[in-house]
């Protein structure tokens, strides 16, 4: 028996399970969106991260990597148990056709499993839904979890898509907006001005000079002179 799984998020650069074959390609009718909450890897329940899920889009394609697991039911079971724990925020497993670049019309593999999510906040508590780019960028720039921060997840995906030769405008645009948020945040941090030794000595000397009010009460003749 053979099991195929399509990865379009962190699985692309970090599958984390034993597989026998890896193939670059794409699926049709879906686009990648950052509309799913992650509360146990790159975020927390109080401050969820935004991670990838798929949204149906008739003319869209989504590039990624298909992983093949061969060796019988036990090997497939172990791989799937790992994936279900890891992809626990995804409430659906969808069967799709997988295409390779050299033949974009004929499926290279059918029945490929892909983890997706129901786009409904009522039936799927992890579904965040779309948001303005700036709002998503602020959330991604600040979310952190046990496995790292949310921005690294996005930047690693951006790099992975570049490495496989299929950069995605949406991912690049979101990553650049996160960089903008991080840059703005760093400029708001004011670094205290360090006083030079010469300035400290001068200020100390200035502070040690007694004022007229400190001198005059002890010298009545000085009072008469000033009057």
Swiss-Prot record:
It catalyses: an alpha-(gamma-L-glutamyl)-L-amino acid = 5-oxo-L-proline + an L-alpha-amino acid; glutathione = L-cysteinylglycine + 5-oxo-L-proline. It holds the Pfam family ChaC. GO terms for cellular component: cytoplasm. It is found in: Cytoplasm. GO terms for biological process: glutathione catabolic process. Binds 2 Mn(2+) ions per subunit. Its cofactor is Mn(2+). It is an enzyme of class 4 (lyase). Its EC number is 4.3.2.7, 4.3.2.9. It comes from the Eukaryota. CDD domains: GGCT_like. Transmembrane segments: none annotated. GO terms for molecular function: gamma-glutamylcyclotransferase activity; glutathione specific gamma-glutamylcyclotransferase activity. InterPro entries: ChaC, GGCT-like. Keywords: Cytoplasm, Lyase. The active site is at residue 87. Substrate binds at residues 5-10. Belongs to the gamma-glutamylcyclotransferase family. PANTHER family: CATION TRANSPORT PROTEIN CHAC-RELATED, GAMMA-GLUTAMYLCYCLOTRANSFERASE 2-2. Converts GSH to 5-oxoproline and cysteine-glycine (Cys-Gly) dipeptide in vitro and plays a significant role in glutathione (GSH) homeostasis. Has no activity towards gamma-glutamyl-L-cysteine but possesses low activity towards gamma-glutamyl-L-alanine. This is Gamma-glutamylcyclotransferase 2-2. It comes from Arabidopsis thaliana (Mouse-ear cress).
């Amino acid at each position: 028996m053979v099991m195929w799984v399509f990865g379009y998020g962190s699985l692309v650069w970090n599958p984390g399970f034993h597989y026998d074959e890896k193939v670059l390609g794409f699926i049709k009718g879906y686009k990648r969106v950052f509309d799913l909450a992650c509360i146990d890897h790159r975020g927390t329940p109080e401050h969820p991260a935004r991670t990838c899920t798929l949204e149906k889009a008739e003319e869209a394609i989504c590039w990624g990597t298909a992983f093949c697991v061969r060796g019988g039911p036990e090997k497939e079971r172990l791989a799937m148990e790992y994936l279900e724990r890891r992809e626990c925020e995804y409430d659906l497993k969808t069967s799709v056709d997988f295409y390779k670049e050299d033949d974009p019309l004929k499926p290279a593999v059918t029945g490929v499993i892909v983890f997706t999510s129901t786009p409904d906040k009522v039936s799927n508590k992890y579904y965040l839904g779309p948001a303005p780019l700036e709002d998503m960028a602020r959330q991604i720039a600040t979310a952190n979890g046990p496995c790292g921060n949310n921005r690294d997840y996005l930047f690693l995906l951006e790099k992975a898509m570049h490495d496989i030769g299929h950069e995605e405008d949406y991912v690049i645009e979101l990553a650049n907006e996160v960089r903008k948020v991080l840059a703005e945040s760093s400029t708001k941090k004011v670094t205290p001005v360090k006083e030079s030794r010469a300035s400290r000595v001068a200020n100390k000397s200035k502070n040690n000079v007694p004022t007229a009010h400190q001198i005059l009460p002890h010298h009545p003749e000085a009072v008469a002179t000033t009057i």
